[in-house]
Amino acid sequence: MLDKLKVINGKLTAGEKPVRLFGLSTHGIAWYPEYICEESFNALKKDWRTNCIRIAMYTDEFRGYCKDGNKQHLKELIEKGVVIAEKLDMYVIVDWHVLCDQDPMKYIDEAEEFFSDMSKRFANKTNVIYEICNEPNCSGTWDKITEYADRIIPIIRSNSPDALIVTGTSTWSQDIHCALEKPLKWDNVMYSLHFYAATHKGTLRSRLERCIEAGLPVFINEFNLCEASGKGDIDIDEANAWYEVIDRLGLSCISWCLSNSGDTCGVFTQNCTKLSGWTDEDIKTSGKIIKGWFEAFADEENTNEQCFRIDK
């Protein structure tokens, strides 16, 4: 059983020792359910040397949970992923993927039911992280997120009192400064920062550094090296600048995404249908760079207290 995750003095710890989590996020599981399998998760741990997987479940678009999705099937996929991750000693993020719905309060009733069910199912699993809203935006202001969190977090805590909870921030999880100015009242909570290197540059990095210096617990639970649309060219210079900050600050980071989509952000080429055994020819340029980041994190010396070492 993995150590419980806990935020201590603004830093993520496991067994009260500093820890860094890193890995890939799935695409929406209604789009790409095939990657929720032991074969893929094991390859990500052994070949990509990751220690965390994020399971993204859209709430609104494309068979979203709150629209036209099969709720029972989506929950079964999540549970399958959690069980596999536990078997492989990987942490797993259950992501309520707010995006087109903008304001997390739009589907508050469904969210309450979902997190009540999930936190009961996974009450005794120390590897589960609850991400309560992916990317609030536009009408999804920090005040709305706070209102939402104040309803969802007590539900999770009633069943999984020690679980780590991650909340999105406004403007597609870029406004971490709003959380710094007006943090949630709950313990063991981290705040999401998302970046796409070709779009989000020095201004957002400076904001991140200021918030970390002030003690805000930040989890980069979605990033890529391309544009925020998931398309376009990657920006190598900006990617390197982001890597330097992430590595220096010892931050946890999850990359979007585990798929063979035609977008730049999908790590595999479109003609790659493998679920493991991926070669360099199967992986897009951005995926190769991100894989290199994860390998570097895993290679950190034991003396680096920010590194979480996994079995090789």
Curated annotation (Swiss-Prot):
Temperature dependence: Optimum temperature is 40 degrees Celsius.
Domain of life: Bacteria
UniProt similarity note: Belongs to the glycosyl hydrolase 5 (cellulase A) family.
Molecular function (Gene Ontology), one example: cellulase activity
Catalytic activity: Endohydrolysis of (1->4)-beta-D-glucosidic linkages in cellulose, lichenin and cereal beta-D-glucans
Keyword Hydrolase recorded: yes
GO biological process: cellulose catabolic process
InterPro entries in the cross-refs: Glyco_hydro_5, Glyco_hydro_5_CS, Glycoside_hydrolase_SF
Catalytic residues as annotated in Swiss-Prot or TrEMBL: E135 (proton donor), E222 (nucleophile)
Organism the protein comes from: Ruminococcus albus
Name recorded for this polypeptide: Endoglucanase 4
Keyword set, alphabetical order: Carbohydrate metabolism, Cellulose degradation, Glycosidase, Hydrolase, Polysaccharide degradation
Activity versus pH, per record: Optimum pH is 7.
Enzyme Commission (EC) number: 3.2.1.4
